[in-house]
Amino acid sequence: MESNKDEAERCISIALKAIQSNQPDRALRFLEKAQRLYPTPRVRALIESLNQKPQTAGDQPPPTDTTHATHRKAGGTDAPSANGEAGGESTKGYTAEQVAAVKRVKQCKDYYEILGVSRGASDEDLKKAYRRLALKFHPDKNHAPGATEAFKAIGTAYAVLSNPEKRKQYDQFGDDKSQAARHGHGHGDFHRGFEADISPEDLFNMFFGGGFPSSNVHVYSNGRMRYTYQQRQDRRDNQGDGGLGVFVQLMPILILILVSALSQLMVSSPPYSLSPRPSVGHIHRRVTDHLGVVYYVGDTFSEEYTGSSLKTVERNVEDDYIANLRNNCWKEKQQKEGLLYRARYFGDTDMYHRAQKMGTPSCSRLSEVQASLHG
């Protein structure tokens, strides 16, 4: 089965190059062979995509650079598109299918429709939809007028719907700003009321091997892990209410701030950190007895924690360390898988080999720790 998988990967690579060379028949032939050798949803989706094209095999010869629908002027100058884009996008060739795809995104009424998923879509469904569409509309791949804005809209849709809080607000209140924009300017306004906490390019890089941005990160506070979203408060259109109305709107926020402040006062911070933190006095290096995890403590730690209390602290240190490893392992796997997927899609052999050589040190260390725990 493993040999079939390798052969299937080879067929996929050939098929992707054929797609780039505008040879759909050849691409379809190798994709079908790959699906017979090692069936995968990705290959099936590519086959369906090729089969859905209006031109069927044998109707006309494969397009070349001279017959490809580039939508250029004969004199070599580029006509600006309906949304004002000229030069950058329209100097390169694009197909009628790409133009139609951009038009479809422009006409979508909500984020679910942009991604092509139902309102009950799971996180995995959202990831699959974004992964497929982001590659299809990325400015490096799609040069049709409006493709860049469509790419941004897809990124914003995923960023909002993948954030539980933003998705809840979006489902509850809809997108009033975008509706107003559509009534005023017609379809095709990508600037919607809900904003993403991450740029479309950063999101794309996070999925396909360009690293993880700092705007949406895992934060370790006092040795404990939590996930933070940088949430922006939506501006209200209806301003000018009386002072009482403003107070009523601000009251939930004031209560939340008060409760948070009281919580911070009532909860004591852990007596250790996983890295040096001079600001809280955690500068003295120690190592746990069981797993040998390095942690840092304050001046009076040795006096305050001995015997069973010390064992409890070190158990917490190791739990935090393992949680940290799991998180970093997940990110390393996502980065590697994203780069492999991108390399296969674009038929980039160098990128594929580079992705294969990428290490996952956190995953390796996690395996060692788990072996020690169960050994």
UniProtKB/Swiss-Prot annotation:
Keywords in UniProt for this one?
Acetylation, Chaperone, Endoplasmic reticulum, Host-virus interaction, Membrane, Methylation, Nucleus, Transmembrane, Transmembrane helix
The cellular location(s) given in this protein's UniProt record come to:
Endoplasmic reticulum membrane; Nucleus membrane
Q: SUPFAM superfamilies, from UniProt?
A: Chaperone J-domain (SSF46565)
Q: Name one GO biological process term.
A: ERAD pathway
* Record PTM Pros-methylhistidine, positions in chain: H185
> PTM details?
Methylated at His-185 by METTL9.
Q: Look up what happens after changing H138Q.
A: Abolishes interaction with HSPA8/Hsc70
Q: Where are the transmembrane segments?
A: 244-264
Q: What is this protein called?
A: DnaJ homolog subfamily B member 12
The organism's lineage is:
Eukaryota, Metazoa, Chordata, Craniata, Vertebrata
